[in-house]
UniProtKB/Swiss-Prot annotation:
Name under which the protein is recorded: Neuronal acetylcholine receptor subunit alpha-9
Pfam families: Neur_chan_LBD, Neur_chan_memb
Organism per entry: Rattus norvegicus (Rat)
Segments in the Cytoplasmic topological domain: 324-457
A GO-annotated cellular component: postsynaptic specialization membrane
Record-level Gene Ontology MF annotations: acetylcholine-gated monoatomic cation-selective channel activity; calcium channel activity; excitatory extracellular ligand-gated monoatomic ion channel activity; serotonin-gated monoatomic cation channel activity; transmitter-gated monoatomic ion channel activity involved in regulation of postsynaptic membrane potential
Effect of residue 86 to I: The CHRNA9:CHRNA10 receptor is 1700-fold less potently inhibited by the alpha-conotoxin RgIA
Length: 479
């Protein structure tokens, strides 16, 4: 039972395959006959219209497949497109009933007339026309030509908001020799087709609207239509944020820290110059990417502003170091500086001497040696001049009486004791004067150092605020 059934199935399959092969053979014969009949007296050099005054309509559709390159420096967009053109050829029609219901054939595109649609704003010397692929010829004369093309078009790049910029690149297609009275061009859709677009790693495509334009040139009175596709691009900024912006922000916050570095370390100016050189390297990296235009990119403005801050901080650091190393030969700190800087600003900025804090009041304690010397000397000896010998002798007599323990009168050799005590008094006054001068000298130097430290701390917070505000403004403008 199964064997006859299998034989019957095999016979049916054989006859079906034979029938299909016979149909294909018949269609092939009719296609060859149709091709011979159509192109026997056909010329692809002339516009395929029966009336020479008639307008031939060409419909254009562009599909964006891939963005191959966006050269901002040379302002060239390289794109991979699929271009579809459709038009009617009045001389390539046939009756389907005469050719076994054959409704379409595919033939080489160079055998038929083709509209000379070119990319107006191409940016390369080589031809960017579509590839010579086959065309689909329908029985009613409708010709459809699908062909891929790699185009290089000029694109005006606005880098003002780089790396947060958006670009608009135009692709303008039109006939090169025919005017609008001979060949008219239309866009098949309101925008380019993005359904088969391959995502780009650097650019986001937000649309590709199409619009028809009719332009009249000064040389000719006839209109010249074209179809312009505007490619809306937005840059993916993550790469530039990580590699250019974040390092710049971190380096810019290092600039105020040069004021926090102790002046005695000798590295304040070196740090500022090193930061300035690092910013210069980043600036050169951005300059290599950007076109040489008058529009300065946003990140370039940030670099320039940061470099200006670093230059100013380095100059101020030199000034502060000059104040810090004021020695004994320098003038005393002015009164207004003592009040404004040492009294108020130092408290506001929490700048104190060693061992001093905001909770413990500052007491000026004299050295123990100086206190002992002044305790031994009467006030009259510290305030009177040396020409008052009479007063000095009286005081010396009192000292002799107290020190020698006499209860009665003064001994006869008082003059010798007076001479000794007078010499001793002069020595003590000299020592006290030296200690006082030494203290005044040290006090003068320490006051200038504290002034420099307060100014350092003041500029540090000022520059921190400026860098922070500048960074926020740049990010706000980018958004």
């Amino acid at each position: 039972m199964n064997r006859p059934h299998s034989c019957l199935s095999f016979c049916w399959m054989y006859f079906a395959a034979s029938g299909i092969r016979a149909v294909e053979t018949a269609n092939g014969k009719y296609a060859q006959k149709l091709f011979s009949d159509l192109f026997e007296d056909y010329s692809s050099a002339l516009r395929p219209v029966e009336d020479t005054d008639a307008v031939l309509n060409v419909t254009l559709q562009v599909t964006l497949s891939q963005i191959k390159d966006m050269d901002e420096r040379n302002q060239i967009l390289t794109a991979y497109l699929w271009i579809r053109q459709t038009w009617h050829d009045a001389y390539l029609t046939w009756d389907r009933d005469q050719y076994d219901r054959l409704d379409s054939i595919r033939i080489p595109s160079d055998l038929v007339w083709r509209p000379d649609i070119v990319l107006y704003n191409k940016a390369d010397d080589e031809s960017s026309e579509p590839v010579n692929t086959n065309v689909v010829l329908r029985y009613d004369g409708l010709i459809t030509w699908d062909s891929p093309a790699i185009t290089k078009s000029s694109c005006v790049v606005d880098v003002t908001y780089f790396p947060f910029d958006s670009q608009q690149c135009n692709l303008t297609f039109g006939s090169w020799t025919y005017n609008g009275n001979q060949v008219d061009i239309f866009n098949a859709l309101d925008s380019g087709d993005l359904s088969d677009f391959i995502e780009d790693v650097e650019w986001e495509v937000h649309g590709m609207p199409a619009v028809k334009n009719v332009i009249s040139y000064g040389c000719c009175s006839e209109p010249y239509p074209d179809v312009t596709f505007t490619l809306l691009l937005k840059r993916r900024s993550s790469f530039y944020i990580v590699n250019l912006l974040i390092p710049c922000v971190l380096i810019s916050f290092l600039a105020p820290l040069s004021f926090y570095l102790p002046a005695a370390s000798g590295e304040k100016v070196s740090l500022g110059v090193t930061i300035l050189l690092a910013m210069t390297v980043f600036q050169l990296m951005v300059a290599e990417i950007m076109p040489a235009s008058e529009n300065v990119p946003l990140i370039g403005k940030y670099y320039i502003a940061t470099m200006a801050l670093i230059t100013a901080s380095t100059a101020l650091t030199i000034m502060v170091m000059n104040i810090h190393f004021c020695g004994a030969e320098a003038r005393p700190v002015p009164h207004w500086a003592k009040v404004v800087i040492l009294k108020y600003m130092s408290r506001i900025l929490f700048v104190y001497d060693v061992g001093e804090s905001c909770l413990s009041p500052r007491h000026s304690q004299e050295p123990e040696q100086v206190t002992k010397v002044y305790s031994k000397l009467p006030e009259s000896n510290l305030k009177t001049s040396r020409n008052k010998d009479l007063s000095r002798k009286k005081e010396v007599r009192k000292l002799l009486k107290n020190d020698l323990g006499y209860q009665g009168g003064i001994p006869q050799n008082t003059d010798s004791y007076c001479a000794r005590y007078e010499a001793l008094t002069k020595n003590i006054e000299y020592i006290a004067k030296c200690l006082k001068d030494h203290k005044a000298t040290n006090s003068k130097g320490s006051e200038w150092k504290k002034v420099a430290k307060v100014i350092d701390r003041f500029f540090m917070w000022i520059f921190f605020a400026m860098v922070f505000v500048m960074t926020v403004l740049i990010i706000a403008r980018a958004d």
